[in-house]
Amino acid sequence: MNLFHLQAPFQATGDQPQAIAQLVNSIEKGNRFQTLLGATGTGKTFTIAATIEKIGKPTLVLAHNKTLAAQLCNELRQFFPENAVEYFISYYDYYQPEAYIPVSDTYIEKSASINDEIDMLRHSATRSLFERRDVVVVASISCIYGLGMPSEYLKASIGLEVGKEINQRQLLRDLVSVQYSRNDLDLQRGRFRLRGDVLELVPAYEDRVIRVEFFGDEIDAIRYLDPVTGNSLQSLERVNIYPARHFVTPDDQLEAACQGIELELEDRLEELEKQGKLLEAQRLGQRTRYDLELLREVGYCNGVENYSRYLAGREPGQPPECLIDYFPKDWLLVIDESHVTIPQLRGMYNGDQARKKVLIEHGFRLPSAADNRPLKAEEFWEKVNQCVFVSATPGNWEIEQSQGQVIEQIIRPTGVLDPEIFVRPTEGQVDDLLGEIKQRIKRKERVLITTLTKRMAEDLTEYFQERGVKVQYLHSEISSIERIEILQNLREGEFDVLIGVNLLREGLDLPEVSLVAILDADKEGFLRAERSLIQTIGRAARHIQGQAILYADNLTDSMIKAMEETERRRNIQMAHNKRHGITPQPIVTRSSNAILSFLDISRRLNAQQLEKVYDQADELPLEKVPELIGQLEEQMKEAAKKLEFEEAAKYRDRIQHLRDKLLGH
């Protein structure tokens, strides 16, 4: 019996059936790695969903950012409405890591804002992995960070069953020990209340209320309640209450951890004093002893993750346990856009260690803090059972690992061909391009233009605007929310031409684009490498009349390879259409409104305007202060994202000042 039940309004077509059969065959043979080389718009997600259904293994789908993970999760939930499709990304709305800048002697404390809903989804993912096998978890790369110990997390869960006798007081103590808090007035996720013989709690992994009714010390009934109406939704025979936090440390292990921290502290202080670093020694001793006192008293301290090696009982250098360790041994990994995700996977460890090294050297953290880290690439691959790489342009490493198991998916279900490619000289390229743009505007089609430099993109935008073309420029400083809005405006025809330096990022699903123009196509480098050219040309692959113009005076190896690969795909597609009598049909895709509906997009003041408003904050009406705080928080998050810690700290202090102003009134 199949664990997964795929539901789709269409059947596999084109070369999807062949790709599905080959993937399933390769995985069932026990091959560790295989690659799905799928052209843009060929329905790779459907192919993966069909493969998951036939293989029937718990699956982790890895994406390289939150937005792409959300899109994949939504698609897979539509394909598997009866199964557990979970979403696991970093739960921080805003995260500024602890940092020290030696040049200015500036220490910045860790500051973070946790998204409660995402935290609930993370708990829901681990709960599903414990309770069922028909699970697909769509995760960002943050899943390689430590997540407590699955064995301790499961051991700490509280099992309740109708008819079971249990001491109510002991049950309350058990709930507190797994990080639930009592609140008889405001029942929220991670809280419980007791009224007479009725216990109500909201578990960490969902927003429904669990009601446990007692008759003496015997459990009489267990029900799910609607959190708003209080109506009974479902009666249960038994239920497991999992801890409110993933990091669970038993009392005996906590004391052993504290003793280990003390021993390391003594050794490190001696080492620093021998080096003449008296300030660093004093700083480290004071901070660590304060943390130890908190750990012993309340079992928690700010920055507790820096002691995770001791709390989890790991040896020095031993990899942390993460989401992957919650999967059973026979799990399946799918890496989407593998040509981007795998390099990101390799870089996570090095970036984390560089920041920690500075903190350790200057006495802010013990050397063991370096073990609070993401997995190294080699540690990650040691945990992988079987893997499918998915990309239109897989990297050499993926191809090598697949050892011949590279499955192509070239045919689009709609019959649309890869774009025609034209090479034109750079002399007079701008005026030539202007003529092409005007033709597309007449047909109500859209144009993408990619340049090599920001300056050229700006100049080109200005040039076209002066000639009456509705054009916008997409640059790296635009936030992801604004970016989605700009792309939506392009699709809806508010402007006709989009210019940018790197238009390879995910989310450029634009069926209205019929022309992609690549300027300076013969300048070798990352943005004009073979894979980058294929990806960029593919932006026009969703339009029946898709074309790509490469402006160049020479033919580089990358250009030749990209054109040969595109022509090879076109020939396969044309032969398939001719053989089956298929007439290409326009690709219809979901508008970005589905994403925008989840985002509160409002016009934001720029940094300079915010400075002026903040300077006059004392004269600002009280009802306007929360709005200013919200906009300052946006700037703080952007600064932290760019690793501008001092700037982010400045915004944090201003936000606190404004909150104090509100409280003072």
UniProtKB/Swiss-Prot annotation:
UniProt binding sites for ATP? G38, A39, T40, G41, T42, G43, K44, T45
The record's Gene Ontology biological-process terms are: nucleotide-excision repair; SOS response
Q: Which Pfam families match?
A: Helicase_C (PF00271), ResIII (PF04851), UVR (PF02151), UvrB (PF12344), UvrB_inter (PF17757)
- Domain UVR positions: 626-661
Question: What positions carry the motif Beta-hairpin?
Answer: 91-114
In alphabetical order, the GO MF annotations are:
ATP binding; ATP hydrolysis activity; DNA binding; excinuclease ABC activity; helicase activity
Q: Which GO terms describe its cellular component?
A: cytoplasm; excinuclease repair complex
* Domain annotation Helicase C-terminal: ranges: 429-595
- Keyword Nucleotide-binding annotated: yes
Query: Which UniProt keywords are listed?
Result: ATP-binding, Cytoplasm, DNA damage, DNA excision, DNA repair, Excision nuclease, Helicase, Hydrolase, Nucleotide-binding, SOS response
Which InterPro entries is this protein grouped with?
A: Helicase/UvrB_N (IPR006935), Helicase_ATP-bd (IPR014001), Helicase_C-like (IPR001650), P-loop_NTPase (IPR027417), UVR_dom (IPR001943), UVR_dom_sf (IPR036876), UvrB (IPR004807), UvrB_inter (IPR041471)
Question: Where does the record place the Helicase ATP-binding domain?
Answer: 25-176
Give yes or no: UniProt keyword Hydrolase: yes
User: What is the residue range of the signal peptide feature?
Assistant: none
Give its localization.
Answer: Cytoplasm
Summarize the subunit comment. Answer: Forms a heterotetramer with UvrA during the search for lesions. Interacts with UvrC in an incision complex.
Primary role: The UvrABC repair system catalyzes the recognition and processing of DNA lesions. A damage recognition complex composed of 2 UvrA and 2 UvrB subunits scans DNA for abnormalities. Upon binding of the UvrA(2)B(2) complex to a putative damaged site, the DNA wraps around one UvrB monomer. DNA wrap is dependent on ATP binding by UvrB and probably causes local melting of the DNA helix, facilitating insertion of UvrB beta-hairpin between the DNA strands. Then UvrB probes one DNA strand for the presence of a lesion.
UniProt-listed HAMAP family: UvrB
Q: What does the sequence similarity comment in the record state about its family? A: Belongs to the UvrB family.
Annotated domain remarks: The beta-hairpin motif is involved in DNA binding.
* Protein name according to UniProt: UvrABC system protein B
Q: Which organism is it from?
A: Gloeothece citriformis (strain PCC 7424) (Cyanothece sp. (strain PCC 7424))
Gene it is expressed from: uvrB
